[in-house]
């Protein structure tokens, strides 16, 4: 089933109980464009950690304006509040805990009204995502997880963006093949896998939102 056909099907099944999460990376651009072209009225959930790059926020504004998105932002504590509760620079001392506070807990909150969630995961992004399926049951969040681009390559993502003149995060042009929070993201070298620039100085592989068996304070280890 193509990505477009899968989106049509899942929207027909779940309607306003379906949402799309966006990180404002290249795969987010593709999915937002597809949803718009298919005329699907889908809420878009953003997990704004308050630690994004300036270019990421600018990309968000361009995409929201172009596609007239209904953006849902779950409540996330400020960085200052986190410093008070957990101490300064938690991302350096315990990145798993930081991701849990700033991404996992807000996503749990955001998904409560929904029965299905569209994500931009692709199998070729990293070994930890190699077994991703297009439709999975997430017992952790109590929703169906829909991954229309699971079988797409990075090359196919860029070809779709180029063919459809879709706005994308300019950090991708500066060597950032995967983009997250400022303290935990660096450009990727040509010989590295796509997500190698994330948490590069640790053995952490994932922020935790896509790990079904992850527990509080233990995200990212597989």
Feature names for model-found ranges:
Residues 1-222:
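Nucleotide-activated chemistry modules centered on ATP-dependent adenylation/adenylyltransferase
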């Amino acid at each position: 089933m193509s990505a477009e056909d899968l989106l049509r099907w899942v929207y027909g099944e779940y309607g306003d109980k379906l949402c799309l999460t966006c990180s404002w990376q290249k795969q987010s651009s593709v999915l937002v464009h597809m949803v718009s072209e298919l005329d699907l009225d889908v809420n878009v959930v953003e997990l704004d950690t308050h630690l994004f790059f300036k270019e990421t926020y600018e990309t968000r504004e361009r995409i929201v304006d172009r596609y007239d998105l209904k953006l849902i932002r779950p409540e996330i504590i400020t960085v200052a509040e986190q410093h008070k509760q957990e101490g300064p620079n938690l991302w350096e001392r315990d990145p798993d805990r930081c991701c849990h506070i700033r991404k996992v807990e807000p996503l749990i909150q955001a998904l409560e009204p929904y029965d299905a969630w569209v994500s931009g995961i692709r199998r070729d992004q990293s070994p930890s995502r190699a077994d991703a399926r297009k439709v999975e049951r997430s017992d952790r969040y109590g929703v169906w997880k829909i991954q229309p681009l699971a079988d797409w390559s990075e090359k196919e993502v860029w070809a779709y963006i180029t063919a459809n003149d879709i706005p994308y995060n300019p950090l991708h042009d500066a060597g950032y093949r995967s983009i997250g929070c400022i303290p935990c993201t660096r450009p990727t070298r040509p010989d590295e896998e796509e997500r190698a620039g994330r948490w590069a100085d640790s053995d952490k592989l994932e922020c935790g939102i896509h790990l079904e068996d992850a527990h509080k304070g233990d995200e990212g280890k597989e």
